[in-house]
Amino acid sequence: MNELDILQLFYDEMKNRSATRDQVFLNMEEEAAAMLSQKLGQSVSVADLQKLTDICIANEWLERTTADPNYKYLSLTEAGLQVILANQYS
């Protein structure tokens, strides 16, 4: 598992909802860890998920949309969308 798997969660949700990146907000907690575990076929802990989420936030690929310092209501940035698109179409 790596940062691209985190970004892919956001992109998949955008496609599922037919929504733009600024309309999709995800929480990187138990539910997201369970979704990634199922998708990747391996156990993903919340701690590992949040560690990679921190890297995505530091790289400005994800952003917090509220004053909540935790992992709720995160949004994909334009830079994050470019990273996932470049990875998919290269």
Name each model feature, range by range.
Residues 6-9, 13, 35, 39, ...:
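Charge-rich, solvent-exposed alpha-helical interaction surfaces
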Residues 22, 67-70:
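Short, surface-exposed loop/turn segments at secondary-structure junctions
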Residues 72, 78-90:
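Short, amphipathic alpha-helical interaction segments positioned at domain boundaries
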Residues 57-67:
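A short, conserved structural fragment
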Residues 1-22:
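Short alpha-helical segments that sit at the start of domains
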Residues 27-46:
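Short helix-coil junctions and helix-kink-helix linkers
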Residues 42-58, 71:
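Short amphipathic alpha-helical interaction segments
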